[in-house]
Amino acid sequence: HCPIDYLEECLSHFWGNKNFYSIDLYGDELAQPIENFKGIYRRAKKEGLRLKAHVGEWGTAKDVRTAVEELELDEVQHGIAAASNESVIRFLADNKIRLNITPTSNVLLGRVADMSEHPIGKFYRSGVDVTINSDDVLIFDSDVSKEYLRLYEAECLTAKELDDIRIKGLR
């Protein structure tokens, strides 16, 4: 939405501030090419920040891979579009890219038909590092505990799998 030079100017006031742990890109992921943010992410990496971006909630599996490669991401917020492409799933697993997934949001926004069909199980069983999160608590009436319970009740993930995801997510 914003011109890149405007974002660069805004961020110039924060570079070097050790109170920041990461950088994240969010908004309409299809508004402009992800490559436009490459310079900002190179600087963020130089500053030692963890690199994240909201991608793959609405786009394609190719968009997820492109974002990871172009921005050198450590983590992807959402990323569920990757489920449609086995080579992208393997790429995420092989490169240890974490997907921070918000199941209830994905169902309510129509990105996944229902919780039992959520691709988080596929990602987990394919070796992709996943975390379970809530998205906009007041809008989706959810929190992390409810997300775990809903995935379990839908038989998307077993109790053992959910516990493993929980433990790995704390690292």
Give the role of each language-model region:
Residues 52-54, 77, 100, 131-133:
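Structural detector of well-ordered beta-strand residues that form the stable sheet scaffold
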Residues 4-22, 29-72, 83-97, 114-128:
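Histidine/acidic residue-rich metal-binding segments in metalloenzymes
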Residues 1, 26-30, 56-60, 79-81, ...:
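Active-site beta-loop-alpha junctions enriched in small/polar residues
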Residues 103-109, 131-133, 149-154, 169:
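Short beta-alpha connecting loops at secondary-structure transitions
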